[in-house]
A protein has these predicted regions:
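C-terminal effector modules of nucleic-acid-centric enzymes and ribosome-associated factors
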Residues: 1-210, 218-254
């Protein structure tokens, strides 16, 4: 059944005017534009407008070709998004990311899931991913793993960064296999949140490895330990294997 419309509703009046003009394409565009926090599917548009799926698909294709909307194709349906809504959303995301980058100097960006829940929670995650990929392709966003940032954002390894990095690497190097807790290391006036951010970056760069809750060490130590264990295991294998061959030879001689 068609959605019940309130009298004098602005969107309803606009729809009636467009219906009078006889342009189904205009009506489709209007509904897509009015859906500012979600993406209407072709099936939903057909239900709203009482048009056939084929008619809606034709209008959607025409709107996409004109650059008025974006269409994200999934297996079961196609999702539509108006360029005007996209511009407004991009402006909001850019402002949010600018503030975020200023506050968190040592992070690659906001987590993709956080941006999804903040701006487009009504959009399915896989459709949201397609939209973010399109923004990355257009140079609006930059992505690194599960982090999204502004294209120009780069982590500056300034004095504070170098101070924390040096403290962490030196402490873990001296500790060997004692695995000191990061929370027990003295970083002076540097906030612990900043220390955690730099620690995550060092893990990303494979300089430090996490072993457990608050347990970290140098990646080089783990690699050396792994090489040593492999060496010992190989020596034991060669020793026992050699003895077996010797015993086998003696038995053969008998």
């Amino acid at each position: 059944n068609p959605t019940k419309k309130k009298r004098f509703n602005a969107d309803t009046i606009e729809e009636l005017k467009r219906k009078e003009s006889g342009s189904s394409e205009d009506i489709i565009e209007m509904h897509i534009k009015n859906s500012k926090d979600s993406m209407l599917t072709v099936a939903e548009l057909a239900k709203i407008t009482a048009l056939s799926l084929d008619e809606v698909k034709q209008d959607v294709d025409a709107l996409e070709e004109k650059g008025i909307i974006k269409v994200f194709h999934m297996k079961k349906d196609s999702y539509t998004w108006h360029r005007d809504n996209g511009k407004m959303l991009q402006e909001e995301m850019i402002k949010t990311l600018q503030i975020y980058h200023e506050k968190h100097l040592y992070r690659y960006g906001m987590q993709k899931a956080e941006i999804h829940m903040t701006f487009m929670r009504k959009v399915k995650p896989n459709v949201f991913d397609l939209y973010m990929e399109s923004l990355v392709g257009e140079g609006v966003m930059k992505r690194r793993n599960e982090f999204l940032s502004l294209p120009q954002h780069e982590i500056v390894k300034d004095r504070i960064y170098q101070q924390v990095e040096s403290k962490l690497l030196t402490t873990f190097e001296k500790a060997g296999l004692d695995f000191p807790k990061v929370s027990e290391i003295d970083f002076g006036t540097v906030p612990f949140e900043v220390v955690e951010d730099i620690l995550l970056l060092l893990m990303e760069e494979k300089k430090i490895i996490k072993l457990g809750e608050e347990l970290y060490t140098l990646t080089s130590y783990i690699e050396k330990s792994r090489d040593y264990l492999f060496y010992v295991k190989r020596k034991r294998f060669d020793y026992h294997g050699g003895n077996s061959r010797c015993f086998g030879n003696k038995q053969e001689e008998r």
